[in-house]
Curated annotation (Swiss-Prot):
EC id: 4.2.3.4
Organism: Cereibacter sphaeroides (strain ATCC 17029 / ATH 2.4.9) (Rhodobacter sphaeroides)
Cofactor(s) the record lists: Co(2+); Zn(2+); NAD(+)
Note describing how the cofactor binds: Binds 1 divalent metal cation per subunit. Can use either Co(2+) or Zn(2+).
UniProt subcellular location: Cytoplasm
UniProt name for this protein: 3-dehydroquinate synthase
GO terms of biological process kind: amino acid biosynthetic process; aromatic amino acid family biosynthetic process; chorismate biosynthetic process
Lineage, broadest ranks: Bacteria, Pseudomonadati, Pseudomonadota, Alphaproteobacteria, Rhodobacterales
Binding site for Zn(2+): 187, 249, 267
């Protein structure tokens, strides 16, 4: 199979997202042209390190590139001040200079944290994303959003800092646990829902075989990245169109906070539930027919995914408390909740005039089904 290259057009800061199998084995040759000296610092997590760090460092060594690595604990809890500070201090101890390159080898947590560390280290060093999860390959590794979570909420501290290169090796997705693969699919399906009905229709047919079909998997990653790249090029810092990428995320972030950023709810699972709620909200507001949320729920169920609040184990707070968590969302403008709603599949738009009582009733109904 060939490697696909999708360019993120940002003028002098443009970069390529390369998608295909075997990219980790060729990482040295891919990264070498970026280097001023043959040395990189790698941030990863303990799970990814056990699977992919040695082959990655071997590929660098074959190209004459020296490397050092720090493996942080795996999981969303790592994406906070303590591990962020640890990563920055380690990069300083490794004497990473402004002209050097930091590599993020891992999923969304590592990509976000390492990218933010690169953004603030010496007021900005370059970094390369090597995403190892489906979610990171189709979403978080592309577009330059970096950051960490705080006690107040998710991604509230961070920076826009674009990578210099993204290497999305679709072969490594075969090592993902099925639950993590399905969670990443929550972000894939989001792209069809927000702006490409044909892609969504293809996913309804191809989705169940993505985990086993390399060609279909590459197509799904490529189309997702193409859509994200187009939107980021138009609106890098989320003043307008880029907000569409947050379809499902206003609900998702509140649910993640309510579940303590734990294994009770993975980010992609929250996105899938959030998309279903956003389409249900759209239907209740008279924006789309009931067929749209029903069709989405049926597809997510067919994929074996979490779809409703009742699919989240353990206790959840009240509708009022969830609304209060949403008010902390970074998408809030002038104190108003901002939702991505839809007039149908592939027809999403930004709305910041959604009546709070309709959202509250939606959440109350969803909680009542638990």
């Amino acid at each position: 199979m060939t490697v696909d290259a999708v360019r993120v057009e940002l003028g002098a800061r443009a970069y390529e997202v390369r998608i295909g199998p075997g990219l980790i084995a060729r990482a040295g040759a891919e990264i070498a042209p970026l280097l001023r000296r043959p040395k990189v610092a790698i941030l990863t997590d303990e799970t990814v390190a056990g699977l992919h760090l040695d082959p990655f460092r071997q590929a660098l060594a074959e190209a004459g590139i020296a490397s050092s690595a720090l493996a942080l604990p795996a999981g969303e809890a790592t994406k906070g001040w303590p591990q962020f500070a640890r990563a920055v201090e380690w990069l300083l101890e490794e004497k990473v200079e402004r002209r050097d390159v930091v590599v993020a080898l891992g999923g969304g947590v590592i990509g976000d944290l390492a990218g933010f560390a690169a953004a603030v280290l010496r007021r900005g060093v370059r970094f390369v994303q090597v995403p190892t999860t489906l979610l990171a390959q189709v979403d978080s590794s592309v577009g330059g959003k970096t950051g960490i979570n705080t006690a107040q909420g998710k991604n509230l501290v961070g920076a826009f800092h674009q990578p210099s290169l993204v290497l999305a090796d679709i072969g490594v997705l075969e090592t993902l646990p099925p639950r993590d693969f399905r969670a990443g699919y929550g972000e894939v399906v989001k792209y069809g829902l927000l702006g490409d009905a044909d892609f969504y229709e293809w996913l309804e047919e191809a989705g169940p075989r993505l985990a086993a079909d390399t060609e279909a998997r590459q197509r799904a990653v490529r189309r997702s990245v193409e859509m994200k790249a187009e939107i980021v090029a138009r609106d890098e810092t989320e003043e307008g169109d880029r907000a569409l990428l947050n379809l499902g995320h206003t609900f998702c972030h509140a649910l993640e906070k309510a579940t303590g950023y734990s294994d009770r709810l993975l980010h992609g699972e929250g996105v899938a539930i959030g998309c279903a709620l956003a389409f249900e909200l759209s239907q209740r507001l008279g924006l789309c027919a009931q067929e749209a949320p029903s069709r989405l729920r049926a597809h997510l169920r067919a994929m074996g995914m979490k779809v409703d609040l009742r699919d989240i184990p353990g206790d959840l707070p009240s509708a009022e408390a969830l609304l209060a968590l949403m008010a902390q969302d970074k998408k809030v403008v002038d104190g108003k909740l901002r939702f991505i709603l839809a007039r149908g599949i592939g027809q999403a738009f930004v709305a910041d005039d959604v009546p709070g009582d309709v959202v509250r009733t939606l959440l109350e109904d969803a909680l009542a089904q638990r």
